[in-house]
Amino acid sequence: MTNKLRSEETITSLSSFMASTLSIASPSPCSIPLSVTKVSPLKRKRPTHLNIPDLNPQQPISTDYFRFREGDAKVSPLKRKRPAHLNIPDLNPQQPIRTDYFSFTDFAHQNGTVSFGGNGFGVVSRNGKKKFMEDTHRIVPCLVGNSKKSFFGVYDGHGGAKAAEFVAENLHKYVVEMMENCKGKEEKVEAFKAAFLRTDRDFLEKGVVSGACCVTAVIQDQEMIVSNLGDCRAVLCRAGVAEALTDDHKPGRDDEKERIESQGGYVDNHQGAWRVQGILAVSRSIGDAHLKKWVVAEPETRVLELEQDMEFLVLASDGLWDVVSNQEAVYTVLHVLAQRKTPKESEEENLVQGFVNMSPSSKLRRASLVKSPRCAKSQSYYYNSENESPSLNREIGSSPSKSPITPWKSLWAKAACKELANLAAKRGSMDDITVVIIDLNHYKG
């Protein structure tokens, strides 16, 4: 009994001791001091003190890692540093740069116009109202190394310049290839046909939707071969009278309309112009894949013997022929040539005689290192055909025997080309204008 009482007292004492201990270790919430600030678990507590080393101001700081040192010129990271020395090869100034052909892109042009002249020809090409130039041309004054054998071509692009550029790059090569060993007139006509069709086929394989009208002339062995597609035209001056050597391929032409309709197509008059399928205003061209069933690439070709009364040939795009008649063109050229007795020295600088310096300047520098005879200086001027005098027709329509066009006057073929191009522009031509004039006297004899 006594032991049981002792055990109960012991348990009671232990319970009292534990209760007092818990009351000390776990104070009530009301006993927490109000001055304690809670710290967010997302923020790091700023240290109360930063140990910043005391740097000696007399101790220099190493700058080995800096990009530029004292005395170096700073270079912008956006610009490349120019090398200290350029090795430019010493070219022999007496060595001519040979070119087998001339084209629109070979010569720098200013204000949308390019012009140059050579021994027996002149060229002018100027941009119309469109944003991009679509005319091209190709001149090979010494075909197969023969100065009396030349190729001339004017190409008028539509739907872009791709077709005209392709023709200018390739047609003359195919003509030379196809004409090899050709003798009779019929063989030459077939050779030109094959060259045009091959050019068309090769361009169509590129899958480009574009087209080009063409007029070409090859002069060789006292004969002239003229071919055309579309509305580019060749006009001959024979004893002061204009003679068209080509017929424009227009959908309104009876034979062309019949051919198109026989192939299941149709010709429609849209705003005063006849058009194939109501779209294209020419019935033959290179390219125009979407109309190829009706717009063929077979040219019409003529072979003529050079005769004494043949004075010059004008090849031009429709930018000229739409506003200037054949006879007006001949009159204008004759008048320009008649007014210039001898060429000025400055004009002689623009001659091209088979060699050319590809200058980027707006003025073509002396192109040939071969000396040509200089002519005496004289006064000269350009004729404005819009202010034509009543006596002009009698003067320029006179017999060639009274005022012959001698070979040296071909120096002014370029001036005559400029006059024709300016005349067309003044009359409101909206299209690109390209004019090539060939002095046929250069190829006679």
UniProtKB/Swiss-Prot annotation:
Its EC number is 3.1.3.16. Pfam families: PP2C. Residues 390-404 have a biased composition (Polar residues). Mn(2+) 2 binds at residues 156, 318, 431. Mn(2+) 1 binds at residues 156-157. Residues 384-404 are annotated as: Disordered. GO terms for molecular function: metal ion binding; protein serine/threonine phosphatase activity. It catalyses: O-phospho-L-seryl-[protein] + H2O = L-seryl-[protein] + phosphate; O-phospho-L-threonyl-[protein] + H2O = L-threonyl-[protein] + phosphate. The keyword Cell inner membrane does not apply. PANTHER family: PROTEIN PHOSPHATASE. This is Probable protein phosphatase 2C 14. The lineage of its organism: Eukaryota, Viridiplantae, Streptophyta, Embryophyta, Tracheophyta.
